[in-house]
Structures are given as C-alpha cells and as structure tokens.
C-alpha cells in the first residue's frame, strides 16, 4: 500500500481504482481510433472463421496499451508507487489480450464482429487483468476475493452504462 493512510471505508475505492482503472481505460480506448490493420491479418482459423474479426486492429491495440500505460503512470505518481507503473502496463496488455480472447470465443460461436455476447463482452478484459495479478502473486490484490467479486459486478454495470453513453454520443455504432 502507498505511504498514505486510507480509512477502511474508502479502502475498496482505492483498491478498485488501483487495480482496475488502467485495464478499464485500456479496454475502452481502442474505440477512439478507426484502425485498418487487423490483428489477425485477415487469417482464417481452422474452423473457417476469422481469428478475431475486422474490429480488432493494431491501431486500437496500441491506443489501448498507450492509454492504459498513461493511466498507470498517473496512478503510480499519485500513490507514490513507481513499481505500479509497470504493473499497470502489464494489466492493460492483459486486458486487451482478454478482449481478443473474447473475440476469438465469439467467432468460434459464430457470433459476428460487433454482435453481443453478454458477460464475455463486459468482463473478458477484467478477468484477464485479474489473472495477471494472480500470476504476479500481488498479495494486496489476492487477499481480497470479495473485492474482486464486487469489482467485477461494478465493471459489468459500468460497461453497460458507458457503452450506451458512447452509442448515444455517436462514438460507437452499437449499444454493446
């Protein structure tokens, strides 16, 4: 934990922002660019379907990594925890890999690019970021399983709300 004393009633907010803000920003950022270079290079998987689909581009991935990294720099500076900067970068990359994994699963299920798959669409990135923290064995993270559960519920709700806002603002073509 940082050098600051945080009262118990605010600790969850601190914890949530520290561990999930960078992955959330990374996951939300690719929509800011209209990429043309597909991550799957238009390759077809052995089942005859695209690996990820037309909406997963290198430009979006790079913007996601950059925005997640910038967020982790901010968090690291605010919390006086420089080591968090690399941890946040890693969680951002894992979040984007989680999003790709979700797209891979959707293609296997014959769900077209841009079409919804509830729960997977909202939580794939957060589950991969969670797995990343477990891989690293970050005690402050893994010691709070209820915080993880609460966080996933909050992320699910936030994802639905922010996607609807982005749709109504014209940033996204679909509400999901």
Swiss-Prot record:
Record keyword Coiled coil present: no
Membrane-topology annotation of the record: Multi-pass membrane protein
Record field: transmembrane: 12-32, 60-80, 85-105, 118-138, 141-161
Signal peptide positions on this chain: none
GO MF entry, a single one: CDP-2,3-bis-(O-geranylgeranyl)-sn-glycerol synthase activity
Keyword match Transmembrane helix: yes
UniProt entry keywords in alphabetical sequence: Cell membrane, Lipid biosynthesis, Lipid metabolism, Magnesium, Membrane, Phospholipid biosynthesis, Phospholipid metabolism, Transferase, Transmembrane, Transmembrane helix
Catalytic activity: 2,3-bis-O-(geranylgeranyl)-sn-glycerol 1-phosphate + CTP + H(+) = CDP-2,3-bis-O-(geranylgeranyl)-sn-glycerol + diphosphate
GO terms under cellular component: plasma membrane
Listed GO biological process terms: glycerophospholipid biosynthetic process
Cofactor (UniProt): Mg(2+)
EC id: 2.7.7.67
Localisation: Cell membrane
Family matches, as Pfam families: CarS-like
Pathway: Membrane lipid metabolism; glycerophospholipid metabolism
Domain of life: Archaea
Enzyme class per UniProt: transferase
Entry similarity comment: Belongs to the CDP-archaeol synthase family.
Purpose of the protein: Catalyzes the formation of CDP-2,3-bis-(O-geranylgeranyl)-sn-glycerol (CDP-archaeol) from 2,3-bis-(O-geranylgeranyl)-sn-glycerol 1-phosphate (DGGGP) and CTP. This reaction is the third ether-bond-formation step in the biosynthesis of archaeal membrane lipids.
Protein name per Swiss-Prot or TrEMBL: CDP-archaeol synthase
Protein's organism: Staphylothermus marinus (strain ATCC 43588 / DSM 3639 / JCM 9404 / F1)
